[in-house]
Amino acid sequence: MHTNWQVCSLVVQAKSERISDISTQLNAFPGCEVAVSDAPSGQLIVVVEAEDSETLIQTIESVRNVEGVLAVSLVYHQQEEQGEETP
């Protein structure tokens, strides 16, 4: 059986005074992890993993809709199919 695996990284620009709250909210999303946050610049690097592109897109939209987020930029995306091939 094949499974699909998707991963992307995002640069999130946010209001600097809200970085801590935003990081907490993003880390609560399934498959979402704040890898780096820099309060003075208001930037976060976020890694998102999902089993399909629809879930990945929904998570990116959820990140975009968090209060205090100003912009979300996709900087990397990889998709792989995993599993055994059967004749």
Swiss-Prot record:
What outcome is recorded for mutants in which this gene has been deleted? Deletion mutant lacks periplasmic nitrate reductase activity, with either glycerol or formate as the electron donor.
Keyword entries, A-Z: Chaperone, Cytoplasm
Q: Gene3D superfamilies under this entry? A: 3.30.70.920
Record has Chaperone as a keyword: yes
Q: List localization entries.
A: Cytoplasm
Q: What is its main location?
A: cytoplasm
| GO molecular-function term, one example from the UniProt record | signal sequence binding
Kindly state one GO CC term assigned in the UniProt record. Answer: cytoplasm
One GO term under biological process is: negative regulation of protein transport
What domain of life? Answer: Bacteria
| Function according to Swiss-Prot or TrEMBL | Chaperone for NapA, the catalytic subunit of the periplasmic nitrate reductase. It binds directly and specifically to the twin-arginine signal peptide of NapA, preventing premature interaction with the Tat translocase and premature export. May have a role in the insertion of the NapA molybdenum cofactor.
Q: Which HAMAP family match?
A: NapD
Family that this chain belongs to: Belongs to the NapD family.
> Subunit arrangement?
Monomer in solution. Interacts with the cytoplasmic NapA precursor.
Q: What name goes with this protein?
A: Chaperone NapD
Task: Quote the gene name from the UniProt entry.
Answer: napD
